[in-house]
A protein has these predicted regions:
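FIC/Doc superfamily catalytic core
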Residues: 1-338
Length: 338
């Protein structure tokens, strides 16, 4: 069994057999470790052992972070490979901590703070807006680059995108429509690329925490197994080459987000996104949806919150639904009758 499959298997056992607290911790660690793949990084066996001790309640997340930090401080003869592993280990532990925290504020300042907390001591510019323009060669674009925001317009662009999103109303939208909009928002702020490095990981953590404010339960499998796909999907959402018939599209990102928060089963393959890929039989826009007692894709967020509680407890009373969701009794009755 490969090292990658080994950590996935070991952490999955806590989800299958663990207590509720262990499940939540394991999911956070799986997402945290999987996200390192967006920059081609892999975590160490020591990180996995530390994660397991945290999941089992033997140490706190702060103690886990201190262990990882101390482990690398003692290893003064590190190779370049170990330096990359150090970054992956430290950042994984920090992501796990952030995902375990309920606190969140929707603002550019929050995104900058997340970046600082993830990369402080790893990058000298953690949490700081870049002061120069950048390009990045992308495999999915045959070596071409996305056009990122100019460094001197980053702050204004961030403020505009966040203000626009804050004013956007999700009321009466189906969950599927919400996914499309969230994918577009994620691709827009990622294109700004406000940081010198670590943009995709910071974007992922920010979006996970933002989506949780809507009541979505994030499926850790998506980031655990498809982090590089996530990055390539962001790239394709922001790249045009009209001369060669290539248009920016969020369809790949929408499929990823749909798997992430709705539990759909789109096949996420990086080769499908390559600009040279041609397939007339590309998978349908209609996904495979796991069997459920209700169609979540057509629900509004308000309806989904109520239906999820009914699905978990079919005998739940209307007054309990009112208390759990904060909705009015008339709203709860309307949803139950629809």
């Amino acid at each position: 069994m490969s090292a990658e499959k080994n950590w996935q298997f070991e952490l999955e056992e806590y989800i299958k057999q663990g207590e509720p607290g262990q499940i939540e911790k394991s999911e956070a660690w799986q997402t945290a470790i999987g996200l390192q793949a967006v920059d081609g990084l892999k975590t160490s066996a020591y990180l996995l052992d530390t994660a397991k001790e945290h999941i089992e309640g033997k140490i706190s997340i702060d103690e886990a972070q201190k262990r990882i930090q101390s482990y690398y401080e003692q290893r003064t003869d590190r190779t370049e490979v170990e330096n990359n592993t150090k970054e992956a280990d430290i950042v994984s532990a920090r992501i796990a901590k952030l995902l375990g925290e309920k606190a969140f504020q929707f603002s550019p300042a929050e995104w900058l703070t997340i970046h600082r907390r993830l990369f402080e001591g790893v990058f000298t510019h953690a949490g700081q807006i870049r002061q120069y323009n950048i390009t990045k060669k992308e495999w999915v674009l045959k070596g071409d680059t996305v056009t990122y925001a100019a460094w001197n317009s980053i702050k204004d662009t961030l403020d505009y995108d966040f203000a626009t999103e804050k004013q956007y109303s999700y009321e009466d939208l189906s969950v599927e429509q919400c996914v499309k909009h969230l994918a577009k928002f994620a691709s827009d702020i990622w294109q700004i690329h406000p940081f010198c490095e670590g943009n995709t990981r910071a974007t992922a953590v920010f979006m996970i925490k933002y989506m949780k404010t809507f009541g979505f339960k994030v499926n850790n499998d998506a980031f655990e197994k498809n982090s590089w796909y996530f990055r390539n999907a962001l790239v394709r959402a922001n790249y045009n080459d009209l001369q060669n018939g290539i248009h920016a599209t969020t369809k790949f990102l929408e499929m990823f987000f749909s798997n992430l928060i709705l539990g759909t089963e789109y096949e996420l393959k990086n080769r499908y996104m390559h600009v040279d890929y041609v397939d007339d039989n590309f998978q349908s826009v209609i996904p495979k949806v796991p069997k459920s007692q209700f169609d979540t894709l057509e629900c509004t967020l308000e309806e989904l919150a109520v239906l999820k509680l009914i699905y978990k407890n079919p005998s739940i009373k209307q007054k309990e639904l009112v208390a759990e969701t904060g909705k009015s009794l008339s709203t709860v009755k309307r949803i139950m009758e629809s």
